[in-house]
From Swiss-Prot:
Underlying gene: dsbD
Keywords: Cell inner membrane, Cell membrane, Cytochrome c-type biogenesis, Disulfide bond, Electron transport, Membrane, NAD, Oxidoreductase, Redox-active center, Signal, Transmembrane, Transmembrane helix, Transport
UniProt source species: Yersinia enterocolitica serotype O:8 / biotype 1B (strain NCTC 13174 / 8081)
Covalent S-S links between cysteines: 134-140, 195-317, 493-496
GO BP of this protein: cell redox homeostasis; cytochrome complex assembly
InterPro entries: Cyt_c_assmbl_TM_dom, DsbD_gamma, DsbDN, DsbDN_sf, Thiol_diS_interchange_DbsD, Thioredoxin-like_sf, Thioredoxin_CS, Thioredoxin_domain
Major localization listed first in the record, in broad terms: membrane
Bilayer-crossing regions: 183-203, 219-239, 256-276, 297-317, 318-338, 339-359, 370-390, 397-417, 421-441
Listed HAMAP family: DbsD
Name listed for the protein in its UniProt record: Thiol:disulfide interchange protein DsbD
CC per GO annotation: plasma membrane
Amino acid sequence: MAQRFITLILLLCSILLAPHSAQASLFGDNSSFGQKSSQSRFIPVDQAFAFDFRQQGDQLALSWQIHPDYYLYRQQIKIVPNNATFGAFTLPEGIAHRDEFYGEVAIFKQQLTLKIPITQAGERASVSVTYQGCAEAGFCYPPETRVVPLSAITAGSSAVTAPPIAAPATPAPAELPFSPLWALLIGIGIAFTPCVLPMYPLISAIILGREKPHSQRRILLLAIVYVQGMALTYTLLGLVVAAAGLQFQAALQHPYVLIGLSALFVLLALSMFGLYSLQLPSSLQTRLVQWSSSQRGGSLAGVFAMGALAGLICSPCTTAPLSAILLYIAQSGNMLAGGGTLYLYALGMGIPLVIVTLFGNKLLPRSGPWMQYVKEAFGFVILALPVFLLERVLGDVWGLRLWSLLAIAFFGWAFILSLKAHSGWARAFQLLLLAALLIAARPLQDWAFGSPTQQSEIKHLAFKQVADLPQLQAALAQAKGKPVMLDLYADWCVACKEFEKYTFSDEQVQRQLADTVLLQADVTANSAEHAALLKELNVLGLPTILFFDAPGNEIPAARVTGFMNASGFLQHLQNLPR
């Protein structure tokens, strides 16, 4: 009996002195679950992206030490001066990175240093620095904004040496969605419009002048010099417009401005379809033609001057495409791409002219209705530009629908034109156009009539939205004794979109959450209310999912940070304390 009593005492002591994890395994799963889930895998934003700054005279240095396995988005870095003026600066190119939902983006890893020349800084001047990044494990931080105080600098006391490529106070000029080489093809295509092609024999004769016959080498040289003069005018136009857009790049990214530019592009495209004509005032055109005619044909200087003036004489066929390209370059704010794009555009228009000057009219195709069709085709090219701009405002879903609408219009137009031909190959081409038309219409069909995929998405995304802490507290009070799940979401959070696409769409996850009140806080705007909500809930970043019991108290052990696939999330739900 005494031996049993001693054994019982020793067993009790071993339990009391055992490690906490052993006790958890004895007293149930809840403690073990809580210990595992409450430990965040992710570090605070100040440790993930250690930000520092230093001002030495008229030079401001901004630096970030980036923790391993974390990265900053290049496009999310914004520099906004207050009561100060900066010289030209640019961000490094960054590392190419592909996001499933955002496509190709540039990121920074390990370290980033940015040096900014200060041309002027008044009393109490400062600069707002905004940046945002993520962890490779599937966790994103809200945009961080730091205010850096600046020492006063007068405009005359600083000598600034600008980098070779200029950038605005909001750095990183936007990349053009097209390769500049497309401008070369567009220029060649414009050469075959009804306002341009018939003029080439006349221009060729003016270039050669009335002197004695030239050698083939001399003819080629004169034609190239004329094209280079025209290209110089276009290149200068591109640089001037890009520089102007550079000063207002932040304003040009505003949704209302993007919508206005899109409407302007549509109006330019309509002129290509013959609704109206766009060109320089006749008085100005007459004066430019007189200046051009006064130049001496056959001489290199005179031919170059004629080419430069010809770049300013816009015909109805070239005004709309040139205006569209200039507007888009201004919106991008990229001077290098702006000048290069316009140079290639002029070069494309000049290639057929060089051929005509060198070999004569025999290589030119016959004029006919097909030239008007070429002009109309470029109307569709111009219509692609507003779709690119509106995608930034409306999002990917509506962007896809706009592309679908544009493709339907183009293939329908091409099909109607093909009906005028009666050969065998034309029938095959018509079938291809009909097939393309049906494929292009698919996004609009899914939108109009719905699809099983869309219906399932609507089902699992049936969250009740809460915008701030009072709304959350009210929603918890109205839960009527049911458990509550709060999903913290933002558009800039890639892993949040992965949760939506891969985890919340799972049928087993949906069944497990059938008796749970689903709340969602969309903190995309990162407003003061959103920041207060995240601070109150002690949230480092997104995705973060919180669970509340029936009385409305959070279950700290159940919190989820970072992406979790459907099977892992389902197991997490099944292990929730009841």
